């Protein structure tokens, strides 16, 4: 698929087809694309935990997501959580390289997730990134260690609807040339 078309087609989907499934090979292809994202000093701190059976997805959603995200992700074939493991943006002696400090881990996670969702779309899958979730419940449900910081929860599956493209700002709205 042409890259520009891919960017234009990708949407946050809030209605998934529960009859369609995602294969292990598709999940691996998506994560392989995510791995290609750049990271601070090549630290590669992003980690994923994937719930791949309908029963686990349903149980996770009920325990870890607010009601509106449970509804929005219903029917998704899988749910993936993205974490930042350890720290990035620091020198070997532990001082921050700049004012962003460990924020680089989240920045890198965002780059990873962008690759993740675009590759999913290229494979014909759809996604919904959910930022509102119960971090404590997720840690308990997936036995996540304290040195991993939750960044995103992503529902993955096949769209049951085709939503309109949301209005975007223009280049003139966001770009200043000097």
Regions found by a protein language model. Name each.
Residues 69-79, 143-165:
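A glycine-rich helix N-cap at a beta->alpha junction
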Residues 89-91, 137-139, 161-165:
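Short active-site-adjacent structural elements
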Residues 13, 36-37:
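Helix-loop element at the rim of GNAT/NAT acetyltransferase active sites that forms part
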Residues 26, 39-109:
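Glycine/small-residue-rich phosphate/adenosyl-binding loop
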Residues 34-35, 80, 86, 95-141:
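Small-aliphatic-rich amphipathic alpha-helix that forms the alpha element of a beta-alpha
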Residues 43-46, 125, 151:
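Short secondary-structure junction motifs
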Residues 13-29:
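A short N-terminal beta-strand-loop micro-motif at the entrance of redox/enzyme domains
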Residues 5-13, 18, 152-178:
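C-terminal helix-cap and adjacent tail motif
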């Amino acid at each position: 698929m042409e890259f520009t078309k891919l960017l234009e087609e990708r949407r946050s989907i809030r209605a998934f087809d529960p009859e369609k499934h995602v294969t292990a090979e598709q999940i691996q292809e998506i994560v392989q694309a995510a791995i290609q994202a750049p990271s601070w000093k090549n630290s590669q701190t992003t980690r994923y935990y994937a719930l791949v059976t309908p029963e686990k997805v349903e149980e996770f959603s009920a325990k870890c997501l607010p009601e509106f995200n449970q509804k929005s992700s219903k029917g998704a074939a899988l749910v993936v959580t993205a974490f930042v493991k350890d720290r990035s943006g620091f020198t070997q002696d532990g001082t921050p390289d700049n004012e962003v400090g460990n924020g680089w881990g989240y920045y890198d996670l965002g780059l990873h997730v962008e690759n993740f969702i675009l590759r999913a779309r290229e494979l014909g899958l759809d996604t919904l990134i959910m930022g509102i979730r119960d971090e404590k419940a997720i840690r308990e449900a997936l036995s996540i260690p304290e040195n991993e910081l939750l960044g995103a929860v992503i529902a993955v599956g096949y769209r049951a609807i085709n939503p309109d493209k949301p209005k975007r700002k223009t280049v003139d709205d966001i770009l200043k040339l000097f």
